[in-house]
């Protein structure tokens, strides 16, 4: 009996220790919108800036963030990518990410078919889904860890391409202190 209690206590301590380690390793993140990242360049047009500001503000209203960032990017073909996110101590990354996906909901519907995809070397959780637009379905992907959360909207891109592009954007935009 005592051996069983000791085993349960040790298992519980291991879980708490592992979670504590993840929080400590991820909590001091910074997030920026680089002028160029992953083959994309910052869209500095008035429309690009206002769209990025709107999404940044909407995300900050949905998720409690200490610092937020938003950017509209263009690829060489003129196709855009919208990126917005922020940093804070995030206790429940997956739940907060799901809340952030809710902000994409509009009169045409919500983000559907959400599922996990590999988060890459920075870890945390990453999910992708799609949302309906006037031009057809658009891929939406996002990540969250204990220090940051971000979403990307990828018109005219496949889910696989969008997920890889978000991992590349994250590698250029996120650092940990």
Residue map of PLM features:
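Hydrophobic single-pass membrane-targeting/anchoring helices
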Residues: 1-27
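N-terminal hydrophobic targeting segments that direct proteins to the cell envelope
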Residues: 18-47
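Short extracytoplasmic
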Residues: 36-66
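A short acidic-to-branched-hydrophobic micro-motif
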Residues: 70-95
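Short Gly/Thr-rich strand-loop-strand
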Residues: 98-136
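Sec-exported extracytoplasmic/periplasmic mature domains
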Residues: 106, 170-175
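A short, surface-exposed interaction/processing loop segment used at functional sites
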Residues: 109, 156-158, 177
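A short, solvent-exposed beta-edge/loop patch
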Residues: 124-170
């Amino acid at each position: 009996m005592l051996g069983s209690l000791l085993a349960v206590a040790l298992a519980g301590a291991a879980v708490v220790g592992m979670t504590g380690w993840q929080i400590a390793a991820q909590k001091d993140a910074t997030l920026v919108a680089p002028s160029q990242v992953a083959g994309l360049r910052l869209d500095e047009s008035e429309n690009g800036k206002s769209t990025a500001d709107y999404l940044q503000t909407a995300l900050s209203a949905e998720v409690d963030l200490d610092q937020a960032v938003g950017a509209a990017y263009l690829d060489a073909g003129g196709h855009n990518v919208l990126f917005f996110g922020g940093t804070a101590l995030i206790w429940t990354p997956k739940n907060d990410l799901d809340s952030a996906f809710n902000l994409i909901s509009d009169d045409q519907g919500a983000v559907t078919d959400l599922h996990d995809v590999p988060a890459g070397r920075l870890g945390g959780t990453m999910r992708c889904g799609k949302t309906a637009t006037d031009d057809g379905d658009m891929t939406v992907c996002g990540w969250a860890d204990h220090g940051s959360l971000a979403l990307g909207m990828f018109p005219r891109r496949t889910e696989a391409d969008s997920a890889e592009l978000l991992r590349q954007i994250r590698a250029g935009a996120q650092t940990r202190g």
